Amino acid sequence: MVAACSPLTRVSEVPYEALCQFLYQEARLLDQRKFDEWNDLFAEGGMYWIPLAEDQEDPVNHLSLAYEDSMMRQVRINRLNHDRAWSQKPRSRTSHTVSAIVVESICEVSNQLFVGSAFTVAEWRSFGHR
């Protein structure tokens, strides 16, 4: 994803607070079930990856919980928003908490910024939380 910078901005000039706000906004969009707006945060060609293992570095040659391009993210969004999504009856309420936000590396050549964070997700359903 591209965080808080226009094509004319060098990533090294993006304030740390803007990076944090970007991640907080992402969490809020998910909690508010604004999945289309969340999907719009991705840069063209951006991938959504949830590694299966904590130390997994490669999403292609190893199993992942999710590794989705734009089309597959849209399929997921359509399924979650569909009236027949029985697994979402009643719909989940979530709380995403983002912390430990760090700039892991900056690549001036490609104008890319790599940011890491920790997050937790709490989900509430009519039968309790998990």
Show where each model-derived region lies:
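Short, low-complexity N-terminal intrinsically disordered segments enriched in polar/charged residues
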Residues: V2-E44
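A beta-strand edge to alpha-helix "cap/lid" segment located at domain peripheries
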Residues: A3, S95, V102-R130
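A sequence-composition feature that detects small, non-aromatic residues
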Residues: A3-A4, A18, A27, A43, ...
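A solvent-exposed, acidic/Ser-Thr-rich amphipathic alpha-helical stretch
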Residues: E44-L113
